[in-house]
From Swiss-Prot:
This is Zinc finger protein 62 homolog. Belongs to the krueppel C2H2-type zinc-finger protein family. PROSITE patterns: ZINC_FINGER_C2H2_1 (PS00028), ZINC_FINGER_C2H2_2 (PS50157). Residues 1-97 are annotated as: Disordered. Residues 9-18 have a biased composition (Acidic residues). The gene is ZFP62.
């Protein structure tokens, strides 16, 4: 032991003395330098320093020599501790804080009479505790790279290897290099599978001694090393030191290839594999390799289905903690990553990095086959499948394969089965959550993808990508039949259906077929009444987004479509086109048969079919023929009852756009058709024609049956049905037939209960506008129809006609039983006596009546309202009979007296 000498501040102990208990020592390890129960704690040795007897250093050293010899001989006889275990402890000491390094390099030995405390090593053998020096020793050896100080030069030499990156020990199995032989020995156990260090608590085995020590702390549950920055606790001071670098930003381990720095050596080691291409960790299921064990561990969860990290907000589970943390930011609304160009925020840093490429225009990932470049590697990987023909995403139902996972997701929705992801707004279900998330943007109105050229927004990136081609002029999808090019694959696919004559998308409600799936989806909403596009201003809903877009202009006041003739502006292009027809313009295409002129040649061609008698378009339901496809399409809606044109003001629906156009003029007040005789204006051309017939000499078409004259031949043809008894318009509910479609429409409201015309004075509703017009005269007192016999006036023309029959003694309405009546309505009521029909039913008790007035009286028995005196006068064979209801007095006049 002559080589042991007194250590002063100016000299360094020899390596043998300095590294007692470490791998470099020639002596066997006397005791565990960091007892497992106190690893990383504020060491008990520190507290013992104050209580130590303050002997001269020389005296203590002499006493310690004998203790060391005794301890060494005991250690040799009781334990055979492997040198690599000690070496490992030595390596670990490089990462310990200075005070723990001091403890590890102290001379061994302490008087048992002073403390008497003993510590067990890993094998259970007890040795005396180490004695710490009383006076602190200055750290004179400083690293000129990072400024860290050491007491001994040998420590500094070992530390410098971190900066130089020198690794002299190479693994002959995988080529991995290490700074020390002990690290290489531990590494080789990865290849051999040897795990010599076993936990006596649970039996779990480890390759290295330090790993076992780390593991043992899980049983004790102690975390005695606390970070004074954030309060986080750790089992070991070395781990705490590494953690502190997060706060300080210190990254002492730098890559010699690219200069990237890391907080710890393991991070650098894994990073270097990027340059070397080394991936030593292989999945035993699919053969995929990884540069680090954690990557393999996470990957294996794909095969096992394990998702240990669950969100406590929504229950969604993830395979990594980081993915869970990223997901949680959705619930918190956190978007901490902000673009300094456009200030757009993102949940994840990776998304921000991808986004920034939009501003730089950088596309670093280039295809070596065709030269196409991409912003990210994933885009290139997917693109390469076009060249390789690889289709890794296979449908487990039908076996069809796809290049993209999104393609498979869309395809799977074709197969029937439960769709687990349901929209809470409208109840629509989806096979995948990603599709549900895309769908939800319909309800939220969220459009996060903005075109940097025109500012137009989109719900998804794919929509934006296709839209950008409008600005660039790129049309990558070309038809191989006619050469026409398109900006999207779906547009090309739809176009090809024209050549094939295909309309593959068939409505399951009315069997109507469409070229496009999108057109079918929109059409189906007519049947389902679904209106997913809601206005956030007034709550009004629409079947499609374009309808909502036009509607929103009502709130914003925007009118982008302006007439260049008069300057009038409109909210939609169709409104402008309709308006333009008011202005006289050039019509260069003239019909040589009737000299009628048209704006377009196509319109002229269609018109000529009228003269030729051609009606090539035939209805497959009723075989009626038409000149134009548009007329056939409109006609078909009679059979399907489809009314796709809806008014955005009052929600009234129409079979064709022209009817909607005319209807809208009620709301706008526009009356473009003016009478050249009296100046009165109307909303439709047909109304003007009808009006003109009131002027003398303006009715050239006369009925040869009754002499009644009409302005148009069409009106005359309709009128003649009265004489011929034709009633082509039949009600499907009750079978009743009518001469005019307008009468059928009014009649249908009896079955539907619809009364769209409401009096603004008393709230009474009517089935038709004429009923409302007559009713309003009750409030105004207006009676424009006066009898020229007796001067009595009436509010309606029909009432006057009925009254005149009293003077003439006529009762033109005869029943088969011989009774006659002045009024058709009275005859209809009378006939119900013979048929037994009682169409008026009480919704309280179900009792039925043959006339409405009886139902009205009956209802008062439920409401408790007092009965009114109602008089009904009917004539039988020229004799007038008076009936008094509820004991009321009979009134003259041949009409009912009703309270106002």
């Amino acid at each position: 032991m002559s080589h042991l000498k007194t250590s002063t501040e100016d000299e360094e102990p020899t390596e043998e003395y300095e590294n007692v208990g470490n791998a470099a020592s020639k002596w066997p390890k006397v005791e565990d330098p960091m007892p497992e129960s106190k690893v990383g704690d504020t060491c008990v040795w520190d507290s013992k320093v104050e209580n130590q007897q303050k002997k001269p250093v020389e005296n203590r050293m002499k006493e310690d020599k004998s203790s060391i010899r005794e301890a060494i001989s005991k250690a040799k006889s009781t334990a055979n501790i492997k040198t690599e275990q000690e070496g490992e402890a030595s390596e670990k000491s490089l990462h310990l804080s200075p005070q723990h390094i001091t403890h590890q390099t102290m001379p061994i030995g302490q008087r048992g009479s002073e403390q008497g405390k003993r510590v067990e090593n890993i094998n259970g053998t007890s040795y005396p505790s180490l004695q710490q020096k009383t006076n602190a020793v200055k750290k004179l050896h400083k690293c000129d790279e990072c400024g860290k100080s050491f007491k001994y030069n040998s420590r500094l030499v070992q530390h410098k290897i971190m900066h130089t990156g020198e690794k002299r020990y190479e693994c002959d199995d995988c080529g991995g290099t290490f700074r020390s032989s002990s690290s290489l020995r531990v590494h080789k156990r990865i290849h051999t599978g040897e795990k010599p260090y076993k936990c006596e608590e649970c039996g779990k085995a480890y390759m290295s001694y330090s790993s076992l020590i780390n593991h043992k702390s899980t049983h004790s549950g102690e975390k005695n090393c606390k970070c004074d920055e954030c309060g986080k606790s750790f089992n070991y001071s070395s781990v705490l030191d590494q953690h502190k670098r997060i706060h300080t930003g210190e990254k002492p381990y730098e890559c010699g290839e690219c200069g990237k720095a890391f907080r710890n050596s393991s991070g650098l080691r894994v990073h270097k594999r990027i340059h070397t291409g080394e991936k030593p960790y292989e999945c035993d299921i699919c053969g995929k390799t990884f540069s680090n064990s954690s990557g393999l561990r996470v990957h294996k969860r794909i095969h096992t289905g394990e998702k240990p990290y669950e969100c406590d907000e929504c229950g969604k589970a993830f395979i990594t903690c980081r993915t869970l943390l990223n997901h949680k930011s959705i619930h918190f609304g956190d978007k901490p990553y902000k673009c300094d160009e456009c200030e757009k925020s993102f949940n994840y840093s990776s998304l921000l990095i991808q986004h920034k490429v939009i501003h730089t225009g950088e596309k670093p990932y280039e295809c070596d086959e065709c030269g196409k470049a991409f912003r990210n590697s994933s885009g290139l990987i997917v693109h390469k499948r076009i060249h390789t023909g690889e289709k890794p995403y296979k449908c487990d139902v039908c076996g069809k394969a796809f290049s993209y996972s999104s393609g498979l997701a869309v395809h799977k929705s074709i197969h029937p089965g439960k769709k687990a992801h349901e929209c809470k707004e409208c109840g629509k279900s989806f096979s995948y959550n990603s599709l549900l998330l895309q769908h939800r943007t319909i309800h939220t109105g969220e459009r996060p993808y903005v075109c940097d050229v025109c500012g137009k927004t989109f719900r998804n990136n794919a929509g934006l990508k296709v839209h950008r081609r409008l600005h660039t002029g790129e049309k990558p999808y070309k038809c191989d039949v006619c050469g026409k090019a398109y900006i999207s694959r779906s547009s090309l696919k739809n176009h090809k259906g024209i050549h094939l004559g295909e309309k593959p998308y068939k409505c399951s409600y009315c069997e109507k077929s469409f070229n496009y799936s999108s057109a079918l989806e929109q059409h189906k909403r007519i049947h389902t009444r679904e209106k997913p596009f809601g206005c956030d201003e007034c709550g009004k809903a629409f079947r499609n987004n374009s309808g909502l877009k036009v509607h929103k202009r009502i709130h914003t006041g925007e009118r982008p479509y302006k007439c260049e003739e008069c300057g009038k502006a409109y909210i939609s292009l169709s409104s402008l086109i309709n308006h333009k027809s008011v202005h006289p313009g050039e019509k260069p295409f003239k019909c040589d048969e009737c000299e009628k002129a048209f704006i377009t040649y196509r319109t002229l061609t269609n018109h000529k079919k009228v003269h030729l008698g051609e009606k090539p378009y035939k209805c497959d339901v009723c075989e009626k023929s038409f000149n134009y496809t548009s007329l056939l399409s409109q006609h078909r809606r009679v059979h399907t009852r489809e009314k796709p044109y809806e008014c955005d003001r009052c929600e009234k629906v129409f079979r064709n756009n022209s009817s909607l156009k005319v209807h809208k003029r009620i709301h706008t007040g526009e009356r473009p058709y003016e009478c050249d005789v009296c100046g009165k204006a109307y909303i439709s051309h047909s109304s003007l024609i009808n009006h003109k017939s009131t002027h003398p000499g303006r009715t050239p078409h006369t009925c040869d049956e009754c002499g009644k004259a009409f302005f148009s031949s069409r009106t005359l043809i309709s009128h003649k049905r009265v004489h011929l008894g034709e009633k082509p318009f039949k009600c499907v509910e009750c079978g009743k037939s009518f001469s005019y479609s307008s009468l059928l429409s009014q009649h249908k409201r009896i079955h539907t209960g619809e009364k769209p015309y409401v009096c603004d004075r008393c709230g009474k509703a009517f089935r038709n506008s004429s009923g409302l017009t007559v009713h309003k005269r009750i409030h105004t007192g207006e009676k424009p129809y006066e009898c020229d016999e007796c001067g009595k006036a009436y509010i309606s023309h029909s009432s006057l006609i009925n009254h005149k029959s009293v003077h003439q003694g006529k009762q033109p309405y005869n029943c088969e039983c011989g009774k006659s009546f002045n009024y058709r309505s009275v005859l209809d009521q009378h006939k119900r006596i013979h048929t037994g029909k009682k169409p008026y039913r009480c919704n309280e008790c179900g009792k039925a009546f043959n006339i409405r007035s009886n139902l009205t009286k009956h209802k008062r028995t439920h409401t408790g309202e007092e009965s009114l005196n109602v008089i009904y006068v009917g004539s039988y064979s020229g004799t007038s009979q008076k009936r008094t209801y509820e004991g009321g007095n009979a009134l003259d006049g041949g009409r009912m007296r009703m309270p106002l």
